[in-house]
Amino acid sequence: MSFDDKVLEIPQTLPMLPVRDIVVFPYMIIPLFVGRDASIRSVEEALAKNRLIFLASQKDITEENPSPDNIYTVGTVAMIMRMRKLSDGRVKILIQGVAKGRVKNFTKTSPSFEVAVEKIEETPVQKTVVENEALIRTAKEHIERIIALGRPLSPDILLVLDDVSDPGRIADLIASNLGIKVQDAQKVLETSDATERLKLVNEILAAELEVMQTQSKNRTGAKDDMSKSQREYFLREQMKAIKNELGEGDSKSEEMDELREKLVNAGMPTHVEAEALKQLGRLERMHPDASEATMVRTYLDWMADLPWSKKSEDHIDLKRSKEILDEDHYELEKAKDRIMEFLAVRKLKPNLKGPILCFGGPPGVGKTSLGKSIARAMGREYFRIALGGVKDEAEIRGHRRTYVGAMPGKIIQALRQAKTSNPVIVLDEIDKLGSDFRGDPSAAMLEVLDPEQNATFRDNYLNVDFDLSNVLFIATANVLENIPPALRDRMEILNIPGYTENDKLLITKKHLIKRQIEANGITEENIKFTDEGIKYLIAGYTREAGLRNLEREVGSVCRKVAKMVVMEETNFVEVNATTVPELLGPPRFQRDDKIADSQVGVVQGLAWTQAGGEVLTIEALKMKGKGHLALTGQLGDVMKESAHAAMSYARAHQEELGIPEDFFEKYDVHVHLPAGAIPKDGPSAGITLTTALVSLMTGTPVRHDIAMTGEVTLQGRVLPVGGIREKCLAALNLGITNIIIPMACQKDLADIPKVFKDKINFILAENLDEVFAVAFDKSAKGQEKKPAAKKDPKKTKSLAA
């Protein structure tokens, strides 16, 4: 059914039906579903009158109850051809567009819309027939190409277009069938000039055609990729079949695929992944039984297992870190403060290239365990590399793959086992690195420990760069002097001092006893350590700066008690000064007692060893002779030179010191240091040797309650020495509370715990005159002569700290 808009009379007012997501054109036949109450009322009103209704599109399709402002004013007058009510309450109508119309005003808005409508007349065609024909042909070509590209349009539209010659009708027909946007369709509907309307439709068709051509290219490319993938798949399947015929089977192919997947997913840098895949290609072409195939396979396994991009996240909590350090280590405040500073900076700036810390100190003081505590405080993986006895550079940098049994170096091995690229690696005993004809491993360590270079560390085995800049390296050493200067320059040295007897007592009570009781299967109900027993154990059975031997002795006591408990000899043992010898036998070390009274030529000096401080008694004896000096006690060259310097000082100051004029013509001098089996060396016995010689030559006794340390010059000046803390604590353990030290060592007193410093009278000396003024016992009987002292002892320099 069709209507000619020239003979159909359109009333002045019509019910209006707002439609969503569609624009209805004249001559367009389309079914509509009506569900809103107001819209159903409009349909019913139209059916009750002349079946004509005005259709206008909503501007906002989401609006359920549109206002007049939300409805386009230009629409289409349509005839309701058929109506059917549905079971869900909606109405289905079939309408045909009759003519364009414009809303003059709304005569009713409730309960349904009613509008006054004026018909929009078609503007006469202004263009020539040729121009219009060109526009029509262009539109038809666009439609044909759009259909060819797969747009779901009815092919009959081309037949309909062939029967229509009016540009306006063609534009409306295309716009109503193309399914364009509502805004574009409304613009076409509102254009009254037929030629301009067709031009607008052609522009829309051109844009749509361009989009569809792009989609077609994308689909074609995707199909090509799929075809290529399918082709590769079929070729691989054929290759498998051929290999099966050759007896190689599927196992190798599956193994290669699995290895390829591991390499691709390992997170390698681009250039490293390219090298790995290149080696994988070589491996695929090799026969499985070839010797080189095993080498390449091992290499690829290493490449796949390394943590190229895997990192553990830092969890730095300074309060918790402090608790961990205090829990794991007693004292060591300087080292702990530096570690806390490092952690604080790392928390503020996570990407900072931090320093390489080196803990230096005697064995057993906790250097290695400090590294483990740092890893625990940061939440990182921990790994220890023992460098003691390493003499081959390849141990650090790896062997080249040309060698049989080649492997990466210790650094790469550590990273593989840690499974992260940012672990804490402790380089233990870095001072024990050696060198021989195979190279110098300390030179290879230069690159590892340099933050500016280790981002491109190249292991000889891998032959590709590996980034070590995220690794936190911590080194430990016993003797810092054994570390090459260039390597030492790359590290920040933190000296870890030995423990005092009081430290050992507290650590034993807090840690060692509990650990050994648990390790040996007994309980606290079976054993009790008294303070006197622990002190006796420390003094008589250990002589070290650390704690290893002490823990062994505590463990030995616990094992003895465990044996007694199992054999039902007793259920409880109190470990005191009496029971320790019964359990462990006689003491292994006898501590020298301090000198009981003042003697001529006998002086108490102070020495430092790796086991801590020692009180060293120096004895001088004269005998008939010609002024010769004999030295015994296994002295080193430096100590011998100190003795000769002391002898020269005595000769040069013979008169003012009160030495008899004929002493050097009548007597030889013999200086001996007891414990002759132990080598001794160093300059710190200088003032002790000089005091002993002058005491012997003048017959003046030396105070028995005083000890001293310091280097001496020929001019009589007292120079600074090291190990002040350990030396002073050793003297205090023997009950010596008066100690002469060089004035320049006053700064070292800060390292002595206050509880010990308060018990010691420190006498600071700048020259030998000040030493003699304090050291010689002027009240001792039998004193024949007194050395002439130019100056009184400087009371202002004597610190009762």
Swiss-Prot record:
It comes from Bdellovibrio bacteriovorus (strain ATCC 15356 / DSM 50701 / NCIMB 9529 / HD100). Residues 780-801 are annotated as: Disordered. HAMAP family: lon_bact. GO terms for cellular component: cytoplasm. This is Lon protease 2. Induction: By heat shock. The gene is lon2. Homohexamer. Organized in a ring with a central cavity. It comes from the Bacteria.
